[in-house]
From Swiss-Prot:
Keywords (A to Z) from UniProt: Cell membrane, Membrane, Transmembrane, Transmembrane helix
Name of this chain's protein: Uncharacterized protein RP489
Source organism phylogeny: Bacteria, Pseudomonadati, Pseudomonadota, Alphaproteobacteria, Rickettsiales
Transmembrane segments: 43-63, 190-210, 243-263, 265-285
Classification via Pfam families: DUF1189
GO cellular component: plasma membrane
Compartments, as annotated in UniProt: Cell membrane
Membrane topology: Multi-pass membrane protein
Keyword Ion transport carried by entry: no
Length: 288
């Protein structure tokens, strides 16, 4: 009973701080004068919440893929994968190289008619065109074109010899499904025990580094325009002003990445509240 009361009390305090961080200048005055520490524990707590949500999305996707390749279930996501796999021609793999009998290049499309794969073992497609396709099957390697939220491309290359253990095999949709079924068998457990901690740490470090510039801005302007403000106080103010943006950022990236700009605008607004609070504190001190 005590533990439940402690958790509910902590949750109530956290929700109150989040609400005030986007609505109250007095809240930041209180953080400035009465709060202690750097606010790093607060940042970690907040980054932990969206990280877990992010991990749940990924874990659910991994389980969906695992069930699909094992033939136990299907969904709208896996229907699209099935549609793409069924377009595959017969691919011969021999001594780390692939070849096809059909005329190349061969494009595989999603149900929305987007290019997902291109098979180009003879290197007939330009690099510019290849960069627009997520998966490129060349003669001796698979090229994966990752695209960030800034639309920048980050190609990743995997040699076929790293994927297939046999020296010679004919790749059909059935063999490919079996390959993924075997490799995804323990994927959910591996993700829970290894992937989840990495993602939690990644988001925490990312949020911390992103706020470092804001900390320097607050520290510099606060000391330039008002009374002396310590770096510890500046860090604490920025950590508490970042609550709502931190919680929303991973969720928006997953569900509606087009609205990522709202996170930046919200952070700018809460930082503005911080500056107003500092100016008002300085004004009150000057009248003493």
């Amino acid at each position: 009973m005590y533990l439940l009361s402690f958790i509910l009390g902590g949750l109530n305090t956290l929700l109150r701080q989040l609400r005030l961080s986007i609505s109250s200048i007095d809240f930041y005055k209180d953080v400035y004068k009465n709060y202690q520490g750097y606010g790093i524990k607060y940042l970690f707590t907040l980054s932990f919440i969206p990280s877990i949500i992010y991990c749940i999305f990924i874990l659910n996707y991994i389980i969906t893929l695992k069930d699909y390749f094992n033939g136990t279930s299907s969904s709208k996501v896996t229907d699209n994968i099935e549609y793409i796999i069924n377009q595959l021609p017969k691919i011969k793999y021999n001594n780390s190289k692939i070849s096809v009998e059909e005329v190349e290049p061969i494009y595989l499309y999603s149900k929305n008619n987007n290019k997902i794969f291109v098979i180009d073992t003879k290197n007939q497609v330009s690099n510019q065109e290849k960069s627009k396709v997520p998966f490129v099957l060349e003669e001796n390697k698979l090229k994966i074109n990752l695209v960030s939220n800034t639309k920048k491309h980050f190609p990743s290359i995997v040699n076929y010899s790293e994927i297939f253990k046999q020296n010679e095999v004919i790749l059909t949709p059935e063999i490919i499904k079996k390959y993924f079924a075997d490799n995804l068998l323990y994927a959910p457990n591996l993700f829970i025990f290894f992937g989840t901690p990495v993602i939690i740490l990644f988001w925490f470090v990312t949020f911390l580094l992103e706020r470092s510039i804001i900390v320097l801005l607050v520290y510099g302007l606060a000391n330039l325009l008002t009374t002396k403000t310590s770096i510890q106080t500046s860090i604490r103010l920025v950590m508490f002003s970042s609550g709502i943006p931190i919680i929303l950022q991973p969720v928006i990236i997953i569900l509606i990445p087009e609205l990522s700009i709202l996170i930046q605008l919200l952070q700018m607004f809460t930082t503005f509240l911080v500056f107003v609070a500092i100016l008002q504190i300085n004004k009150s001190l000057s009248h003493i």
